[in-house]
């Protein structure tokens, strides 16, 4: 099997979310991975330390992603350097409250030595469409 790059993992992550495939998305991460979405303190992560480990990442999915009614994205640009990919992406979602939103983000995906995602860090700003 060919080793996936961080860019491949980024696309796989986005496609799994778009398709609503929770288990497929969670399988992209290793046991010690961290998700910071967004980076810094937020309603889902008041201390801004991220969601670390399989159980915390699963809770993040269930709380932040599972309720999204519609999800689409457009990758504007990707920069790959070693085991990291910086992805400039525009998300178009319909949130759980039924409101459409457009969010521009810079996501950093870091590939672990085992070929899974070691980290997903997202900087974003949202606005209603």
Language-model segment annotations:
Residues 1-32, 129:
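Short, low-complexity N-terminal intrinsically disordered segments enriched in polar/charged residues
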Residues 61, 88-95:
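Short beta-strand segments that buttress and anchor functional surface loops
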Residues 73-79, 90-92, 104-110:
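Hydrophobic/aromatic beta-strand elements that line small-molecule binding cavities or substrate pockets
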Residues 67, 93-102:
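Short, cysteine-centered beta-strand-loop-beta hairpins and adjacent loop/turn segments enriched
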Residues 4, 23, 28-82:
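A solvent-exposed, acidic/Ser-Thr-rich amphipathic alpha-helical stretch
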Residues 102-129:
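Short beta-strand edge/turn micro-motifs at domain boundaries
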Residues 32, 80-84, 109-117:
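Short, solvent-exposed coil/turn segments at beta-strand boundaries
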């Amino acid at each position: 099997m060919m080793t996936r790059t961080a860019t491949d993992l980024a696309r796989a992550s986005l496609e799994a979310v778009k398709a609503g495939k929770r288990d497929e998305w969670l399988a992209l991460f290793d046991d010690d991975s961290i998700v910071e979405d967004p980076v810094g303190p937020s309603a889902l992560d008041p201390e801004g330390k991220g969601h670390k480990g399989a159980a915390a990442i699963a809770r993040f999915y269930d709380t932040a992603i599972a309720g999204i009614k519609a999800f689409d994205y457009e990758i504007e640009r990707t920069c790959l350097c070693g085991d990291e990919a910086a992805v400039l992406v525009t998300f178009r979602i319909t949130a759980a409250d039924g409101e459409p939103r457009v969010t521009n983000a810079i996501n950093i995906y870091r590939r672990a030595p085992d070929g899974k995602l070691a980290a997903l860090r997202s900087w974003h700003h949202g606005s209603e469409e």
